[in-house]
């Protein structure tokens, strides 16, 4: 029997309106037996105008189609080539509907027997990919795609990815492939037929040694860490000297001193606070101290960071470099809380649950493939979003471990003694519960970027009740006996009657009525919240595009909560004495929902700080109620300070006014800390100049146009004189976008790449910024820190405004109860810290040279200016107008040109 041929099709069109728009380019790549066997490509003439957006997206201009055929001239040829093939496309509905319409206009009835959507295929085959856009997939799998949104290249790329996916399926254990087949019957297209053929043609073989089996699940075996065999007879200085020499790094006595201080805290189980200026190489210092501690004592160290970026830098760059220099194995791994790791029993329960829901079906297939690949069992590898994430978290919350369960966190616990360095982040450090956490595994902890710890603690102490979440959780139960969990109860009652099961009768109608009453009570609860929002003073957050209400009477909400909790308690009593599996599943779901309401009710009764938020003022469905359950100081004391014998807090910005007292206030205990303010900086006054314009008017929020124009004028002067890259930091998205619009309109920036901060794209934007010689990056809060600005020439950082949090910020509201003076004790130190972090973006090594421009005149006229001025002590300072700025730039450019 001949193997099927796949016609992988991609179309470019004048738009996405099927009834109006037309095809302007077609690309087809033919695949048989996982090999590309041919291609077809043609531009297609149209009498429609090609919109500018489409021209920009596809790089197809109207004159490129002048000599191209109309579709009707090549329709017969295309039809002959794809007839009998499996029709394949990425997001197939678009391409299939357009080509069927175009064929129909040529009196050709095209109806492919089988259709496959590669968007569906790739979601299943590549469960850990962060994006399923074609360009992102190509990059992730090493396929070169030079011209995205050109039909011929997109079709070829899709075909190559399809082959990779098929080969992956064919390498899976047979039992896994069979399960994928049964699940794929619930998908939208014909992937099940393709998987069936793979099963039918599968070469019988025993299960590979790489795999093991738990119930019906085939999973990749975990390989234990081997005990490290480190042979090094020297002290820390010898270790530091060897590593710096082997890696070609500069020997820095102050960096060695920092490492020695950290080692001393570890050796004597001390608690310490260390400020080591930005660019001082502190991560290298604490890694070597941790390694030396392990060599001398056999004990291991936990290192906590605040970003995934820094985690990845430690695990993928810094630690491998040290391994290479020393030529011996270092066991270092990422460690999280227990709930972040998968239990195979949970996967088994998810697979057993009957559901025809499309997203749940995709998730089940993803889990089956992921568990054959993962070494860690880290659930975040799946990057679940939307409905899948809500479904999985609900299953995780209600999961009761089965007998002989295999939990991946136990792998970490089992190997703890052989892990020399554990890497975690602040969120996991604070979230972990004492009975199943990383605290059992490590006595010693180093917390890098410790100044960010309170922010993560604040997230941890805040509980949330959202309309969307509760609606989803109730939806899993269903509203009628033909839906979801209610259907399983109805089937159980029918089974009881027909098979005379020895269980009490189930009042399905009564249960259904109760469930609908709970739905109504939930609607009433959020209607009450909606009415409160509409009648209250509303504050806006432009960053997250949310609206907030802080001052309101919680009594009406408490009344509605009491009613819904009472109804849920009565419903739970309905299940008393029933132990059937289906009953347990429904009861667990009601318990989960009830606990969510009870936690919020208790906090409101205790008069904890709370606020309401709404994304769309006209949609009740976007409401969230947030309540602060604990003080940040309490959680940091109990969850961090009390849990480790040795604890070192380290940051480039840990002091305020040259004192650690502000950071000490985050802990409830009067405890002695060793404190060190270390001058390891490589910055000399000649490297950096801080320029403060005196010709920029004070910021006025009612009219910021003049302020924005002044900023742009200074940027123009900089790029005109220096012709190098520039980072501009904002505290407002509105101002950032105003500057962006002006820059994009001006001819002075034609040669520049202008990049703007985007959600979930920061890492990629930083890479792009660092790769261009002429680039301007506009960013807000996240770019004030944790960002390595690379440039061969003069570097420039412009700070539009001092980074004070808005007094309507939720953080301000939530933290108000913990301070006598919120501004002096919290807001001002936070702003100074962020300002110092912003300054630190500029000089990261002894070779860097640059200029900082701070436009906010509060830096020189406010009654708190001295706290910011202390941040500028190590820099040359100049005040002047734009002409003096230009003179300074010319001088810097001349000095930089003299560098060897």
Curated annotation (Swiss-Prot):
Q: Name one GO molecular function term.
A: DNA-directed DNA polymerase activity
Q: Which residues form a coiled coil?
A: none
**SMART domains attached here?**
EXOIII, HELICc2
Instruction: List, alphabetically, the GO terms of the cellular component aspect.
Output: cytosol
Query: Motif DEAH box: which residue numbers?
Result: 448-451
| Enzyme Commission identifier(s) | 3.1.-.-
List the InterPro entries hit by this protein, alphabetically.
Answer: ATP-dep_Helicase_C (IPR006555), DinG (IPR006310), DnaQ (IPR006054), Exonuclease_RNaseT/DNA_pol3 (IPR013520), Helic_SF1/SF2_ATP-bd_DinG/Rad3 (IPR014013), P-loop_NTPase (IPR027417), RNaseH-like_sf (IPR012337), RNaseH_sf (IPR036397)
Query: Which residues take part in binding ATP?
Result: 276-283
Q: Where is the Helicase C-terminal domain?
A: 714-883
Q: Report domain Exonuclease positions.
A: 8-161
The keyword Nucleotide-binding belongs to this UniProt entry's keyword annotation: yes
Keyword Acetylation among record annotations:
no
Q: Which CDD domains match?
A: DEDDh
Main role? 3'-5' exonuclease.
Entry similarity comment: Belongs to the helicase family. DinG subfamily. Type 2 sub-subfamily.
Protein's name according to its UniProt entry: 3'-5' exonuclease DinG
Gene source species:
Staphylococcus saprophyticus subsp. saprophyticus (strain ATCC 15305 / DSM 20229 / NCIMB 8711 / NCTC 7292 / S-41)
Q: Which gene is annotated as encoding this protein in its UniProt record?
A: dinG
């Amino acid at each position: 029997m001949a193997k099927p041929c796949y016609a992988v099709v991609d179309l470019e069109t004048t738009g996405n309106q099927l009834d109006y728009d037309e095809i302007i380019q077609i690309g087809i790549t033919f695949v048989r037996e996982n090999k590309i066997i041919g291609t077809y490509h043609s531009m297609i003439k149209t009498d429609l105008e090609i919109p500018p957006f489409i021209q920009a997206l596809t790089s197809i201009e109207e004159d490129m189609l002048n000599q191209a055929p109309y579709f009707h001239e090549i329709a017969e040829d295309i039809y002959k080539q794809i007839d009998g093939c499996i029709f394949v496309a990425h997001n197939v509905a678009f391409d299939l509907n357009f080509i069927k319409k175009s064929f129909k206009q040529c009196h050709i009835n095209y109806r492919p027997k089988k259709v496959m959507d590669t968007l569906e295929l790739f979601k299943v085959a590549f469960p850990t990919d962060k994006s399923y856009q074609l360009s992102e997939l190509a990059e992730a799998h090493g396929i070169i795609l030079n011209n995205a949104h050109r039909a011929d290249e997109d079709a070829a790329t899709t075909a190559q990815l399809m082959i990779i996916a098929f080969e992956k399926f064919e390498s899976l254990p047979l039992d896994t492939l069979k399960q994928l087949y049964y699940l794929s019957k619930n998908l939208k297209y014909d992937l099940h037929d393709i998987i069936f053929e793979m099963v039918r043609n599968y070469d019988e073989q025993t299960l590979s040694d790489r795999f093991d089996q738990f119930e019906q699940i085939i999973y990749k075996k975990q390989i234990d860490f081997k005990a490290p065999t480190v042979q090094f007879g020297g002290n820390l200085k010898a270790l530091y000297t060897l590593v710096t020499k082997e890696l070609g790094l500069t020997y820095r006595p102050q960096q060695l001193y920092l490492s020695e201080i950290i080692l001393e805290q570890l050796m004597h189980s001390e608690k310490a606070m260390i400020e080591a200026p930005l660019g001082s190489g502190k991560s290298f210092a604490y890694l070597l101290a941790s390694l030396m501690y392990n060599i001398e004592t056999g004990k291991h160290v936990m290192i906590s960071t605040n970003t995934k970026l820094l985690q990845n830098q430690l695990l993928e760059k810094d630690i491998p470099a040290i391994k290479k220099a020393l030529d011996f194995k270092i066991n270092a791994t990422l460690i999280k809380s227990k709930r972040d790791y998968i239990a195979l029993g949970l996967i088994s329960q998810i697979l057993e649950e009957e559901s025809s829901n499309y997203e749940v079906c995709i998730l089940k297939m993803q889990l089956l493939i992921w568990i054959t690949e993962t070494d860690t069992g880290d659930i975040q590898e799946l990057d679940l979003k939307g409905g899948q994430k809500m479904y999985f978290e609900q299953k995780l919350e209600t999961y009761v471990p089965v007998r002989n369960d295999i939990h991946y966190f136990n792998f970490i616990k089992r190997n703890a003694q052989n892990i020399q360095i554990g890497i975690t982040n602040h969120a996991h450090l604070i979230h972990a519960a004492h009975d199943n956490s990383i605290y059992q595994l490590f006595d010693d902890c180093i917390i890098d970027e410790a100044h960010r710890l309170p922010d993560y603690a604040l997230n941890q102490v805040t509980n949330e009740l959202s309309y969307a979440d509760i609606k989803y959780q109730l939806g899993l139960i269903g509203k009628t006996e033909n839906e979801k969990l209610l259907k399983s109860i109805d089937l159980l009652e029918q089974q009881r009657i027909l098979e005379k099961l020895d269980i009490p009768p189930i009042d399905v109608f009564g249960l259904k009525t109760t469930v609908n009453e709970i739905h109504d009570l939930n609607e009433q609860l959020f209607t009450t919240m909606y009415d409160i929002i509409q009648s209250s003073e509303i504050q806006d957050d432009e960053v997250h595009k949310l609206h907030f209400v802080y001052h309101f009477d919680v009594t009406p909400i408490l009344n509605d909560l009491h009613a819904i909790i009472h109804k849920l308690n009565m419903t739970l009593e309905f299940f008393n004495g029933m132990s059937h599996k289906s009953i347990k599943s429904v009861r667990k779901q009601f318990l989960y929902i009830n606990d969510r309401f009870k936690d919020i009710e208790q906090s409101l009764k205790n008069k904890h700080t709370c606020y309401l938020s709404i994304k769309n003022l006209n949609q009740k469905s976007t409401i969230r109620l947030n309540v602060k359950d604990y003080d940040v100081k309490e959680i940091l004391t109990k969850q961090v300070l009390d849990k480790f014998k040795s604890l070192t807090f380290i940051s480039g910005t840990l002091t305020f006014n040259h004192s650690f007292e502000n950071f000490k206030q985050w802990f409830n205990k009067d405890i002695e800390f060793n404190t060190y303010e270390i001058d390891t900086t490589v910055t000399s006054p000649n490297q950096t100049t801080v320029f403060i314009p005196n010709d920029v008017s004070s910021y006025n929020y009612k009219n910021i146009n003049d302020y924005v124009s002044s900023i742009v004028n200074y940027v123009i002067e900089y790029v005109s004189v220096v012709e190098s890259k520039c980072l501009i930091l904002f505290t407002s998205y509105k101002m950032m976008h105003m500057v962006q619009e002006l820059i994009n309109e001006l001819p002075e920036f034609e040669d520049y790449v202008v990049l703007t901060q985007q959600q979930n794209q920061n890492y990629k934007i930083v890479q792009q910024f660092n790769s261009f010689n002429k680039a301007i990056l506009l960013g807000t809060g996240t770019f004030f820190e944790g960002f390595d600005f690379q440039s061969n020439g003069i570097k420039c950082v412009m700070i539009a405004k001092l980074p004070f949090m808005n007094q309507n910020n939720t953080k301000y509201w939530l933290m108000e109860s913990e301070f006598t003076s919120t501004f002096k004790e919290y807001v001002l130190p936070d702003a100074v810290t962020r300002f110092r972090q912003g300054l630190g973006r500029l000089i990261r090594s002894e070779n860097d040279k640059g200029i900082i421009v701070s436009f906010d005149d509060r830096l020189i006229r406010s009654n708190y200016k001295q706290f910011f001025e202390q941040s500028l002590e190590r820099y040359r300072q100049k005040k002047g107008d734009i002409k003096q700025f230009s003179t300074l730039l010319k001088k810097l450019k001349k000095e930089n040109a003299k560098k060897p």
